[in-house]
Each structure stands twice: as C-alpha cells, then as structure tokens.
C-alpha cells in the first residue's frame, strides 16, 4: 500500500505544513501600530505626513494599496472640437440666428445718431434722425437737450474780441476821468472838445495853416493824458515834466477848433503856439505845459473865445530854426542866471529887442520845459495852482566882466495877457522901472551872448 502513494502529493503536504508554521510564528519586523497608537510627533520623510515614519507600512510610499490613485475622468469627445467650423447658409436662418442678427443691427442703426451729435458739437445743423422707433429717438433727444449750450459757447468766442476793445477804451476813459477830477471846469471843457474831434484830427492835430512837424506832434499829446511821453522833434527839444505835459495835451486838442473859426490876429508868439520852436534852444517854458495857477492870465489862456492867442501857428520855419540862422525869437539868460534855483528860464518877445532884457520869471519846478515863445506870465510849479502866488519878474543885467546878474522884481498881475497890445503896453512900464539902475547894452551884443549861453545849455541838457 505504501508503494501506491504519489510523491508529488507528499511534497505538497510538506509545503503546506511549512507555511502554516510560518504563520504561527511571531512576525520578525515591527508591526504597524493601530490607528489610536500613532504618534503625531513622528513625521515621514517620504510622504511628509505625521504619525508614522518612513519605515512604517502605513506610509503610502511603502504600501501602494493604501494610497489613493487619482481616478481618470475619461475622454469626452463632445467637449473637444475636432472638426473645423463650416459657414452656414443664411437663406434659412434659424430663430436663434434671427435674434443675433437683430442685436447686430441695433448698433449699426445708431451710427446716424452719432453723426447728428457730432454736427451739434461742431455747430452745424443736425441731420434728421432715421425713423428707427422710440428706443432710437429718445436717447438722441436727451443728448440734444444736454448738449444745447455747446453751440452757444463756441459761437460766443467770436464776439468777445469787440468787448476787449471796449474794455480798453473804457479804461482810457476812466483814466481821463481821473485826470478830469483834479482839473478845473475850464480844463474839463477843453477835454470834452478834444473828445469831439475825429480820430484823424487827433492824429494830425493841425489845421490847414499848420505846416510844421512840431505842430503835428502836438496832436498826439491829448492821447497821452495819463502817462504822457514826448518824443524829440527834428531839431531836438527837451523833455517836459509830467505835470506840464498833462495840461499841455488837454489844450492842444482844443486849439485846432478855435483856429478854424478865426485865423491868426497877430504874429506875437504865444505859449501854446511855438511849443516845439527850436529858436536858440533856450529853456523857455510854455503856458499850458504845467498845472494852472490861480490867476486871471491863465484862465484867459484856457478860454476859447480869446482867439488872439491862437495866431502863433503861422510862425515861419525861419523863426523856428532861428537858432542857426541868427534870427532868434526869444532871448534867454546864460546858465549863471539859473543859479537862483531849478526854475524855468525867462522869455523875451522878439517885438521888444531894444528894451532891457526884463522877462517874466516863473516859480521854480523840477526840470526845464520845452523851448517856447511865451508872451505872458505863467506859473509851472504844481503847487502854484492852489497857492495863488503873485508872478515874479526877473531883471537880468550884464556886468563889465561879461557875466550876468539877476534880480527879482514884483510885477502886477495881467488882466488880459492874450492881447498883444496889453502885454506890449505893460512890458515897457516894467522895463522903465528897471532901466534906471542898469546899463544899456546894444541888442546885438545881447543876442550874441544869449545865443552862446543857450547853445551851451542845450549841450548840457543833451548830456543829461
């Protein structure tokens, strides 16, 4: 019976017995602790988790059975567009395609509205909006109302140029008004007459019988009331103080009107007439050049009916340039006579060359005025218009050593200095009083001395 046993079966039994013994034996390696026995202080170096070490079987890197394998979602062919898009035929569009077409047409229909708004901003008349329904017209109407003031703003820029010119003229008139506030009523009347002149007359400022460039220069002076600036004439004249130039500008504008009414009555030079006469270049003052004194002669000079004073415009050019030709209109003392103080130089009429050089002496002011041929007593000091001081006469006498001496003489006030007869009648009266203590000198010698002294003063003034 023993011979009948199969050796293969016996070998199988042996293997089974060995496996059972191995299972009964204790495990050789450390057993994995239960979940409640995990130590949170341990950290696995492989997976980075806490509670086990890298040698533990709980590590998913060691035991892949416990690891969670990411499950694949699978492949969906519907999500991927493998076939290219083919253009559809628009002959029979579906309902969805119709809605899309309407949405695309709406912005296209708003283009004419945008053009209309652009025309409104540019100031052009807007075009008629297309009949697109209530939704298309309402927004355009709202925008038109909101942008209404824009065309007014653009068109209002053009007429703003005229108000600027009006403002400048208003400032000039206000400046003249400020000057008129400090002037007398007679001087205001002269300025009102100057404003009535045309612009062409203001530029020329001369009548038909005023052919001299110096007279043309006088026409511009009324415009320079607030800040007067006098340019030098051809012959060269001196600067004028601002106080003298303001009043002179007011009177120059009124001069052409009175001259047109009545021509020159006398050839006796007056202060406003030869304002720019070059004569000997003497420092002769002009009557209206400074502030008016409170005297009757000054008021008569500013009075328009007094027309004999308007005759000096007919002075020939030889008399204006008499300094070079040897025919001086006025006589002037040498610089030694001006040592009394900064005052205007005296004047002598050319009608009285044989008399003793007794001339009107003006109250002192800052600087000498323009050379003029003045025949009446005038005050140029700014404060003299309010003081009412009596005019002074200065007597110049030539000494034996060639020098001059001056002395002040009280002179009676003139009542009508405009009339040449009155002045000539009173001038000898004063000269007779002063001729007693002085020595009579030939007029030719006096002319030569005065011409030399005036030329030296001109050179000094040019250097200044």
Curated annotation (Swiss-Prot):
<feature type="compositionally biased region" description="Low complexity">
    <location>
        <begin position="180"/>
        <end position="197"/>
    </location>
</feature>
<feature type="region of interest" description="Disordered">
    <location>
        <begin position="415"/>
        <end position="437"/>
    </location>
</feature>
<comment type="similarity">
    <text>Belongs to the FAM90 family.</text>
</comment>
<protein>
    <recommendedName>
        <fullName>Protein FAM90A15</fullName>
    </recommendedName>
</protein>
<dbReference type="InterPro" id="IPR041670">
    <property type="entry name" value="Znf-CCHC_6"/>
</dbReference>
<dbReference type="Pfam" id="PF15288">
    <property type="entry name" value="zf-CCHC_6"/>
</dbReference>
<feature type="region of interest" description="Disordered">
    <location>
        <begin position="1"/>
        <end position="42"/>
    </location>
</feature>
<dbReference type="InterPro" id="IPR039213">
    <property type="entry name" value="FAM90"/>
</dbReference>
<feature type="region of interest" description="Disordered">
    <location>
        <begin position="70"/>
        <end position="389"/>
    </location>
</feature>
<feature type="compositionally biased region" description="Basic and acidic residues">
    <location>
        <begin position="97"/>
        <end position="114"/>
    </location>
</feature>
<feature type="compositionally biased region" description="Basic and acidic residues">
    <location>
        <begin position="74"/>
        <end position="89"/>
    </location>
</feature>
